[in-house]
Amino acid sequence: MNTAVLLFSTPMDFARKGVVADISQFLVAHKGSVLHSDDHLDSGRNLLLSRLEWDLDGFDIPTAEFEKYFKPLAERFQIHYHLALTQH
């Protein structure tokens, strides 16, 4: 199975505004199936830290173009992120 892992951080205020839900909806809208999601609130640094992994089977965004599609969402929520590809 080929999967993608999105590691991201964003100011904690955006956690209350649905950033995780919006990212999950973005993935599902592009036929991604979320396999794992882990979140951590770092109140000392005022950050939401998150890891989302999804199955790439059927995902309709080529991984090389992910940044182009994800950029508007990243800018809206001030997201810093890293995308990694894995094989299980």
Q: Which stretches of residues belong to each language-model region?
A:
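A conserved regulatory-domain signal marking ACT and ACT-like small-molecule sensing domains
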Residues: M1-H88
